């Protein structure tokens, strides 16, 4: 006997996240009351997570093209040409809400999902990165969330067999009720063997691949498009459950299948599951899709059409198959022990038709499920400008040596070794620069060429001045890639914001995108993929605006990649870039002086490019022994990191024309520290002058301590103890 679907009522519509005007739009579009299954389909396809209804208008203004861009936004992942017939495929995506509800599985399936986005394009994953934001350390849930998220990321990546090579982790009370878990994956493919999601051909079979479908993750995308209240625990069933070993089998089976020529189009079943993947493939190819859900492999009995369509069970793919190669394709998946089921076909009707148990459960216009989704030009208000804080107006509460010692043992600046040692960053044997440097560096194959990878954002800058913060997020990623000697090539972004229905939040979003676009254009650093995560809000309070940037650069010879560690005594230490001593929104002002205030440091994009290009040439010419960009904590923290990494001390001096605490801890942008031999230092200084690059000698390496002239020397061993001690002590509940 056919099951009875619930009646579509205003309450049911509201529970699906659809506003009254959006429901009226559905009625006008299809000319009738939708079935329960159709309501679920619209809810999935028109939610913020899938439709980008609040952000699409502004995303269009971002720069996405360059001669080396093969595929920009709109596919599973972005693709760039990296030479020698190879392409780099990469994307960053959020799994914020699920990771707060169930940190281990939420983070693990975030990794699994982004890996599928990459290998769906025909690329073999070679690296993962992440960007994590947790609440205040003293918040009662923070330890639990850190522990679960880190374990989930490590478990999935390690089991799947891809190294997690880099990331960025910080803490702030603004994330108490909404943590951020942004996962990035990078893969390598032949540039002429990229696979896309666009279906072609009428009557071609649609094939379900991978794991069986269960009830986990139903309405995961809808949940990710809503603000959190106090009922987060009740949403636990919306969190997917991952199996990295099955995903590894799926990877190998898909790559083998792609070599047979059987694949016409392929799409990961991610957010909104079977619904989204089927609709996207059909709509991109201007084709209809007809599904027979009786053929869907299920691991639970009695699943309804609604449940099968909206399940976000992991490790699943949907493919349009060349009908002449069905037997060959099936044999591949049988060999790998995975499901292979023909569940439908392409049609010329431009309709999305779903059948189950002899009934038509859905019959909808396929293009309108995506193209007719609401598109909002939401009201937005620019953030008020904050005044510049002069360093001379700040009374230092500690000596500069004391402030440095304090900063190195703070949650944001301390070593994250406790985190990255839970990730296998060597599993493929391709890691050249391991976690802890400016950017991760991996070797490609047996040759000298490599990739540099980084994730960056400074939310306190974005909150104080969204445009400047957006510029800085991109500039910081570009600078980190440059600091290891890479040529920055492209960006993936992950835009994490609060409720876009609030004009001040939408203003943050628009401002950050303005700054991001300006920086990407100025630095020739196009955006090729990304993700938007809105409604990161709990109890009416949004998170700090966090537009995460994932950067990818190419290194011609990884043997020349620069490292941040001081290598030997007697080297000259040179500071590249102008230093005014900018303390507004600095960690010194926040963690030493107890103030979050002032305008953030401006980013002069012309100076950023000029200084970075100069540093990259120094690295290529092998003129420097160590390089480090200057960011959080300023010059003194960067020097300490270089000294601790190499076990070599330094003696450095501030100029008389900048207040000392501003010189050591100001977060002025576009700056690097380089170390070079004394005999080369004069040549570097002269070359900088010719290039119009500010460069000054501030000291030399040597000894077992870091000495800021006029201050007590601090032993490197003491700095390291503070730097390495905070996070393990915190996680052991010793603080």
Swiss-Prot record:
Pathway: Purine metabolism; IMP biosynthesis via de novo pathway; 5-amino-1-(5-phospho-D-ribosyl)imidazole from N(2)-formyl-N(1)-(5-phospho-D-ribosyl)glycinamide: step 1/2. SUPFAM superfamilies: PurM C-terminal domain-like, PurM N-terminal domain-like. Keywords: ATP-binding, Cytoplasm, Ligase, Magnesium, Metal-binding, Nucleotide-binding, Purine biosynthesis. InterPro entries: PRibForGlyAmidine_synth_PurL, PurL_linker, PurM-like_C_dom, PurM-like_C_sf, PurM-like_N, PurM-like_N_sf. Its EC number is 6.3.5.3. Part of the phosphoribosylformylglycinamidine synthase complex involved in the purines biosynthetic pathway. Catalyzes the ATP-dependent conversion of formylglycinamide ribonucleotide (FGAR) and glutamine to yield formylglycinamidine ribonucleotide (FGAM) and glutamate. The FGAM synthase complex is composed of three subunits. PurQ produces an ammonia molecule by converting glutamine to glutamate. PurL transfers the ammonia molecule to FGAR to form FGAM in an ATP-dependent manner. NCBIfam families: FGAM_synth_II, PRK01213.1. It is found in: Cytoplasm. ATP binds at residues 52, 91, 493, 530. Its main location: cytoplasm. The gene is purL. It catalyses: N(2)-formyl-N(1)-(5-phospho-beta-D-ribosyl)glycinamide + L-glutamine + ATP + H2O = 2-formamido-N(1)-(5-O-phospho-beta-D-ribosyl)acetamidine + L-glutamate + ADP + phosphate + H(+). Mg(2+) 2 binds at residues 117, 268. Belongs to the FGAMS family. GO terms for cellular component: cytoplasm. It is an enzyme of class 6 (ligase). Pfam families: AIRS (PF00586), AIRS_C (PF02769), FGAR-AT_linker (PF18072). The active site is at residues 49, 95. The keyword Transport does not apply. GO terms for biological process: 'de novo' IMP biosynthetic process. This is Phosphoribosylformylglycinamidine synthase subunit PurL.
């Amino acid at each position: 006997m056919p099951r009875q679907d619930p009646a579509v009522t205003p309450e049911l519509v509201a529970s699906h996240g659809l506003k009254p005007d959006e429901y009226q739009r559905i009625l006008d579009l299809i000319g009738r009351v939708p079935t329960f299954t159709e309501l679920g389909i619209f809810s999935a396809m028109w939610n913020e997570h899938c439709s980008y209804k609040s952000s699409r208008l502004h995303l269009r203004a971002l720069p996405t093209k360059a001669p080396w861009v093969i595929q920009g936004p709109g596919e599973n992942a972005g693709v760039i040409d990296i030479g020698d017939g190879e392409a780099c495929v990469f994307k960053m995506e959020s799994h914020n809400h699920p990771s707060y509800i169930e940190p281990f599985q939420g983070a693990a399936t975030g990794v699994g999902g982004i890996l599928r986005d990459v290998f769906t394009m025909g690329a073999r994953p070679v690296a993962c990165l992440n960007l994590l934001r947790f609440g205040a350390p003293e918040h009662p849930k923070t330890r639990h969330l850190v522990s679960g998220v880190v374990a989930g990321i490590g478990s999935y990546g390690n089991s799947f067999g891809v190294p997690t090579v880099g990331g960025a982790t910080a803490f702030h009370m603004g994330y108490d009720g909404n943590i951020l878990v942004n996962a990035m994956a990078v893969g390598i493919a032949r540039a002429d063997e990229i696979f896309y999601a666009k279906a072609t051909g009428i009557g071609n079979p649609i094939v379900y691949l991978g794991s069986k479908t269960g009830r986990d993750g139903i309405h995961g995308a809808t949940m990710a498009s809503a603000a959190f209240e106090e009922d987060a625990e009740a949403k636990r069933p919306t969190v997917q459950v991952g199996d990295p070993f099955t995903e590894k089998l799926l990877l190998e089976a898909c790559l083998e299948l792609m070599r047979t020529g059987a694949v016409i189009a392929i799409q990961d079943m991610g957010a909104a599951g079977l619904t989204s993947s089927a609709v996207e493939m059909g709509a991109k190819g201007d084709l209809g899709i007809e599904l027979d859900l009786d053929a869907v492999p299920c691991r639970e009995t009695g699943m309804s059409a609604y449940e099968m369509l909206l399940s976000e069970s992991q490790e699943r793919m949907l493919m349009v198959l060349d009908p002449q190669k069905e037997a060959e394709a099936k044999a591949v998946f049988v060999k790998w022990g995975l499901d292979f089921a023909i569940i439908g076909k392409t049609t010329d009707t431009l309709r999305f038709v779903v059948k189950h148990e002899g009934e038509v459960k859905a019959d909808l216009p396929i293009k309108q499920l995506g193209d007719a989704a609401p598109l909002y030009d939401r009201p937005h208000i620019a953030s008020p400008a904050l005044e510049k804080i002069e360093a001379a107006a700040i009374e230092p509460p500690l000596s500069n040596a004391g402030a440095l010692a304090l900063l190195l043992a703070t949650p944001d600046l301390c070593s994250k070794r406790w985190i990255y040692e839970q990730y296998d960053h060597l599993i493929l044997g391709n890691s050249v620069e391991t976690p802890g440097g400016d950017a991760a560096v991996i070797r490609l194959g047996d040759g000298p060429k490599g990739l540099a990878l980084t994730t960056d954002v400074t939310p306190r800058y974005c909150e104080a001045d969204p445009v400047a913060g957006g510029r800085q997020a991109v500039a910081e990623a570009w600078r980190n890639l440059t600091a290891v000697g890479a040529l920055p090539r492209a960006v993936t972004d992950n835009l994490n914001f609060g409720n876009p229905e609030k004009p001040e939040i939408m203003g943050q979003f628009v401002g950050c995108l303005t700054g991001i676009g300006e920086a990407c254009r100025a630095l020739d650093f196009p955006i090729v993929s990304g993700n938007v995560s809105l409604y990161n809000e709990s109890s009416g309070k949004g998170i700090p605006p966090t537009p995460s940037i994932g950067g990818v650069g190419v290194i011609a010879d990884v043997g020349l990649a620069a490292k941040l560690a001081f290598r030997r005594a007697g080297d000259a230490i040179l500071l590249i870039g102008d230093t005014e001593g900018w303390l507004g929104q600095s960690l010194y002002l926040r963690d030493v002086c107890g103030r979050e205030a002032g305008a953030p440091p401006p980013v002069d994009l012309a100076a950023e490019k000029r200084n970075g290009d100069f540093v990259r040439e120094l690295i290529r010419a092998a003129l420097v022994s160590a390089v480090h960009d200057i960011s959080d904590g300023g010059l003194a923290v960067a020097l300490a990191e270089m000294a601790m990494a190499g076990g070599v001390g330094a003696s450095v001096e501030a100029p008389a024309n900048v207040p000392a605490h501003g010189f050591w801890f100001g977060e002025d942008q576009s700056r690097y520290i380089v170390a070079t031999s004394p005999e080369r230092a004069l040549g570097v200084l002269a070359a900088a002058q010719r290039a119009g690059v500010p460069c000054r000698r501030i000291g030399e390496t040597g000894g077992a301590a870091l000495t800021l002239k006029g201050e007590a020397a601090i032993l490197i061993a003491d700095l390291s103890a503070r730097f390495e001690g905070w996070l393990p002590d915190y996680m052991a509940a010793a603080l």
